[in-house]
């Protein structure tokens, strides 16, 4: 028997609360004065890198992202170095989909590639991101993947700070899928 929309919605709400509790318990939510990657100042910081080093929290993230991926037409899980790599790796293990790591720049040694893993033009990727603010950090990775001929229509972020990333990604025909929003996390 399939679940109704209200059952699915309740399930996502329970999952969100489970993730919020895990993020707080592992110390990933901090208060103080911080400068974000976007250059913005903030009174709070969400340290998903800390969360990704906690096996219980990482497992919750991977499981919840995998459930979202079941609804998507994708065949590869991608993550941008550094923060996206443990997330994408855990999700790849959970979904058994291939992993692609997107480097921030080309290395001047070895394969001299922006990618670790196989990327084919027919691939349909979902990108994992730790925290989204303006969406600028992930936009470069999306463009590099698309320049290689692959398709990328979804970015799953653990936490969306709700500061424009969804709108910016929509302009690039990418749907932002947050596991939790900052407003929910900071309640």
From Swiss-Prot:
NCBIfam families: pyrE. Keywords: Glycosyltransferase, Magnesium, Pyrimidine biosynthesis, Transferase. Orotate binds at residues 133, 161. Homodimer. The gene is pyrE. Signal peptide: none annotated. GO terms for molecular function: magnesium ion binding; orotate phosphoribosyltransferase activity. It holds the Pfam family Pribosyltran. It comes from Methanosarcina mazei (strain ATCC BAA-159 / DSM 3647 / Goe1 / Go1 / JCM 11833 / OCM 88) (Methanosarcina frisia). Its cofactor is Mg(2+). It is an enzyme of class 2 (transferase). InterPro entries: OPRT (IPR023031), Or_phspho_trans_dom (IPR004467), PRibTrfase_dom (IPR000836), PRTase-like (IPR029057). This is Orotate phosphoribosyltransferase. Belongs to the purine/pyrimidine phosphoribosyltransferase family. PyrE subfamily. It catalyses: orotidine 5'-phosphate + diphosphate = orotate + 5-phospho-alpha-D-ribose 1-diphosphate.
């Amino acid at each position: 028997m399939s679940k109704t929309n209200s059952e699915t919605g309740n399930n996502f709400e329970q999952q969100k609360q489970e993730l919020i509790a895990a993020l707080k318990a592992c110390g990933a939510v901090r208060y103080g004065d911080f400068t974000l990657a976007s250059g913005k100042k903030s009174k709070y910081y969400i340290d998903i890198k800390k969360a990704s080093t906690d096996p219980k929290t990482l497992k919750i993230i991977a499981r919840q992202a995998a459930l979202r991926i079941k609804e998507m037409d994708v065949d590869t899980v991608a993550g941008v170095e550094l923060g996206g790599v443990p997330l994408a790796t855990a999700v790849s293990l959970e979904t058994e989909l291939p992993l692609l790591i997107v480097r921030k720049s080309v290395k001047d040694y070895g394969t001299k590639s922006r990618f670790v893993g196989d990327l084919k033009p027919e691939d349909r990727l979902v990108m994992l991101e730790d925290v989204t603010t303006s969406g600028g950090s992930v936009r470069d990775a999306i463009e590099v993947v698309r320049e290689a001929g692959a398709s990328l229509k979804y970015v799953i972020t653990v936490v969306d700070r709700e500061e424009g990333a969804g709108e910016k990604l929509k302009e690039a025909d990418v749907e932002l899928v947050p596991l939790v929003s900052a407003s929910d996390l900071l309640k």
